[in-house]
Swiss-Prot record:
Disulfide bonds: none annotated. It comes from Roseobacter denitrificans (strain ATCC 33942 / OCh 114). It is found in: Cytoplasm. The gene is rbfA. The lineage of its organism: Bacteria, Pseudomonadati, Pseudomonadota, Alphaproteobacteria, Rhodobacterales. Monomer. Binds 30S ribosomal subunits, but not 50S ribosomal subunits or 70S ribosomes. This is Ribosome-binding factor A. GO terms for biological process: maturation of SSU-rRNA. The keyword Cytoplasm applies.
Amino acid sequence: MRFMGKNKFHTGPGPSQRQLRVGETIRRALSDVLARGDVHDTDLNRLSVTVGEVRASPDLKIATAYVLPLGGQGKDEVIALLARNKGELRRLVAKKLTLKFAPDLRFQLDETFDRMDETREMLNRAEVKRDTGPVPAGESDTE
C-alpha cells in the first residue's frame, strides 16, 4: 500500500528538489512584487528589501522568506511591515505560482551577510592564516 504524501525519491535530511524549486519561484515572485511596489502600503514601498532565500516546508504550506533591507538599516521595521502586509503579499505571489494552495508567508531577517563577515574576520586572524597558509618546501603532513 502506497501513501500519497510520501516522497519516495527524497530520504535525506535536507530539502527536496520540489521544495527548492518552489522556494526559488516564491523568492523571485516576492522580489518582483516588492521591487515594483505592488503592495498598497506606502511605508513598505519606500523601502528597498532584498529577499535572499525562501525555504518551503515539506508540505509546501509554509514559506519562510529571509529578507534584509538595503543597507541593513531598519531591520525590525521591515519585518513588521512585511508581516502587516503578508495577506496581500501572499495573494500577489500566489498569482505567479502554479500551486494548488498559496503558502503562508513568514518573514525572518537574513543573517547570511553577518555570518560571512564573521567568517572573513576569522580567516584574517594570524593563527588561522598560519594554519591555512602554504606549506613550506620540504614539510608536509604525509611524512
